[in-house]
């Protein structure tokens, strides 16, 4: 599924502003965690009654990079969003500021299966309080 860049950027920024975890991201963070995923079609936005209620971004990483990321020793780069041939699928951002987390996660699993043709394990890195 191809996304509209301007809509994704506008709706993504709105969700970032509504999230206590994301509202203080700087320009570099916005590029890394929103614009780059939009550029490489590694984002899905979810809507209810025409209003954005959630988004997910992802990339593929090697096992080594994934472990470093998990240990906070690796920062996602734009290149991480390019390839889908690396070993591990990583969910990078999950934003559901209106309490629709379970709905967004379930839709994401279905989306990944449709896009990649397999039921892929999604690795997540849970952050601590902002």
Task: Locate the predicted segments by residue.
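Generic hydrophobic, helix-prone segments enriched in Leu/Val/Ile
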Residues: 12-15, 34-38
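Conserved beta-hairpin
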Residues: 36-56
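Acyl-donor binding region in acyl/amide transferases
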Residues: 66-130
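Short, His- and charge-rich active-site/binding loops that engage polyanionic ligands
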Residues: 59-62
């Amino acid at each position: 599924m191809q996304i509209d860049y301007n809509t994704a950027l506008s709706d993504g920024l709105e969700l970032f502003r509504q999230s206590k975890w994301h509202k203080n991201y700087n320009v570099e963070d916005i590029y890394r965690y929103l614009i780059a995923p939009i550029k490489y079609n590694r984002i899905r936005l979810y809507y209810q009654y025409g209003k954005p209620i959630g988004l997910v971004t992802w990339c593929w990483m090697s096992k080594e990079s994934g472990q470093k990321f998990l240990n906070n020793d690796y920062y996602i780069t734009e290149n991480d969003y390019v390839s889908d041939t690396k070993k591990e699928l990583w969910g990078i951002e999950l934003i559901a500021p209106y309490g629709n987390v379970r709905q967004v996660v379930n839709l994401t699993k279905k989306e990944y299966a449709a896009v990649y043709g397999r039921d892929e394990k999604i690795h997540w890195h849970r952050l601590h309080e902002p």
